[in-house]
């Protein structure tokens, strides 16, 4: 974790992440996010590579997430509640901040065609089967992947 100042804001930069398919438990995977929360960091910009299942996408497209579908059967909030982390049953209706997505859309206009999509998270490490890709499309996913 590296800290830099960008336009009078302290910014934390993290490189890489643990993946569920590497055998890490879900609590270890979310540890960096919880550290950032303890540091009172309220906003994250996270990137990953994903497979596009939306026929309107092309390889290399940059897509802002508007929602996700967790197909792993795991959730870091399962288990004893940690009150300091927030509510036991958090509202997930606006996980991907609409205001930030609008800013991204505005900024991207001069550089690339802005797209938004829904990400379906699979456990990996195998790539998704054709049936899984079809299922993901059927339930509303635009992207599939195994990144956490």
Descriptions of predicted regions:
Residues 93-94, 98, 127, 138-147:
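Active-site glycine- and acidic-residue-rich loops that bind
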Residues 23-30, 94-102, 126-130:
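Electropositive phosphate-/nucleotide-binding environments in soluble metabolic enzymes
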Residues 21, 89, 93, 121-125, ...:
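Glycine- and other small-residue-rich loops at beta-strand/loop junctions that grip anionic moieties
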Residues 30-38, 101-105, 134-137:
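Predominant activation on well-ordered alpha-helical scaffold segments within soluble catalytic domains
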Residues 106-142:
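Active-site/ligand-binding-proximal alpha/beta "capping" segment
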Residues 1-92:
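Metabolite-binding pocket within alpha/beta catalytic cores that recognizes anionic/polar moieties
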Residues 16, 50, 67-69, 123, ...:
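Histidine- and/or cysteine-centered catalytic micro-motif in compact active-site loops
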Residues 88-108, 118-120:
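Charged, glycine-interspersed solvent-exposed loop segments at helix/strand-loop junctions
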């Amino acid at each position: 974790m590296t800290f830099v100042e960008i336009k009078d804001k302290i910014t934390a930069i993290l490189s890489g992440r643990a993946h569920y398919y590497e055998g890490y438990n879900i609590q270890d995977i979310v540890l960096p996010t919880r550290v950032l929360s303890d540091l009172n960091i309220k906003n994250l910009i996270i990137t990953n590579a994903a497979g596009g299942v939306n026929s309107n996408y092309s390889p290399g497209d940059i897509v802002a997430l508007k929602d996700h579908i967790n197909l792993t059967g795991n959730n870091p909030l399962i288990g004893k509640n940690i009150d300091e982390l927030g509510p036991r049953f958090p509202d997930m209706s606006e996980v991907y901040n609409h205001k930030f997505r609008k800013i991204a859309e505005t900024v991207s206009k001069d550089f690339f065609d802005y797209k938004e999509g829904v990400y379906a998270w699979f456990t990996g490490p195998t790539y998704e089967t054709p049936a899984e890709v079809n299922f993901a499309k059927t339930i509303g996913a635009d992207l599939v992947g195994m990144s956490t």
